[in-house]
Amino acid sequence: MLSFFKKKIVVPHVRLTGVIGAAGRFKQGMDLAGQRAILKKAFSFKKIKHVAISINSPGGSPVQSHLIYSYIKQLAKEKKVKVIIFAEDVAASGGYLISCAGDEIYANSSSIIGSIGVISASFGFKDLIKKIGIERRVYTAGKNKSTLDPFVDEKEEDVKRLKSIQLELHADFIKVVETSRGSKLKEPEKNNIFTGEFWTGSAALKLGLVDGVGNADQVLKEKFGDKVIIKN
């Protein structure tokens, strides 16, 4: 017997927004602990073939970025589901790392995409505390316990140690991007893709950092038809 009813396609849609980092009672942040339940729910729908995830994040903690990325990959593998990522205002640094969990990445033409690098920033207060007459006392067990102390002169060995950690984290980030994007990337060295530079969505498309330009509703309807059910 022929069916006169076309099977409806359902695509769960999750939104991940904010600076990436551990959240607390008085601190907002996007971390795996806060996103685990909504991600698990999205992948738990029966008979789905795709999950859509919109990302709006400038980055943050490399650890939480990687944890969220890995959890999305894990769920996709377990449920045999494809992941479609949609970058909104920004998917940069850790936000882009999470985007790499997608089988496809889309962005708005004006989205900010990339910033594949690592940054650390601080201030030096040595002259300030001297000027206002504050005497600082520090007691440690372990000669490197006060590494990068902002109240004393910067030490060359401290900076060197920090740089080595940054390079290690950067290498891990690059590996994730290369694994995700592969041959889609257009001449990474020539185009400074791994230098921390960032681009608009339109420029990112030309570099192979995203697969297309468009928003979730538009792209999902183009892919699955006007009657696709997007479960937000």
Language-model region placement:
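N-terminal organellar transit peptides
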Residues: 1-108, 119-232
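Short glycine/proline-centered loop/turn elements that form peptide/ligand docking sites
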Residues: 112
